[in-house]
Amino acid sequence: MRALAAAPLCALLAACASGAAEPRFTVVTVDPAHQRLQLFLNDEQGRPYRRLEKLAQALAKHDRKLVFAMNAGMYHADFSPVGLYIADGVALSPLNLAHGKGNFFLRPNGVFLLTDAGARVIESSELPALHDKIHLATQSGPMLLSHGVINPVFDPGSRSVHLRNGVCAVDGKAVFVISEDPVTFHAFARYLRDALKCRDALYLDGSVSSLYSPALGRNDHRAELGPIIGVVAD
């Protein structure tokens, strides 16, 4: 494992690559109690950022630094979110409980959210019963893990491999994971369960999966992106 060497955030933002057998993963842990975790979609002109680097440049104009960023859920051709999107407490896209084709609609899908209690991942169907004030939320799918159980739709023998990224929550902290090698859904979920001790984990996307982290020397650009999640420092 290698630790993030970005003082003064080294004690708060931990990143590592698994150094054992393939496949490899990079893990970034964010503590919302000490770090500013935000969702981003459009710039000041209402245009989608599309690239992690463009978001970093826009923040820099206001003397703010993008410490970490990752694609944060699935999106339409116009880059708008497929499902729930809440930024700064304001819902810009509603919860999507429809049936359809594609990974987003594989059951169950879920929501990553941030409340005063910290980060959480829940199944989408559970959201209407949640009464906590939500500061940010992004809906995606499918759930990789629910209550410690790998999604039963995943085939351990599948040959469908892609770069993938996802998120879980451990003790109120957000744990973001991106694979450095193409992996199956099952292998990805198993890593989050066994190596990271996640109980509920959400798939964010595959193939387009991208990471921004100056401390790790990362500025990925695999595709144009919709929702982006990141840590911002002044």
Residue ranges and their predicted role:
Residues 79-98, 153, 157-169, 173-200, ...:
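Conserved, well-ordered active-site substructure
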Residues 31-33, 78, 113-118, 146-148, ...:
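Short acidic-glycine loop/turn motifs at beta-strand connectors
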Residues 23, 106-108, 160-163:
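Short, surface-exposed coil-to-beta transition loops
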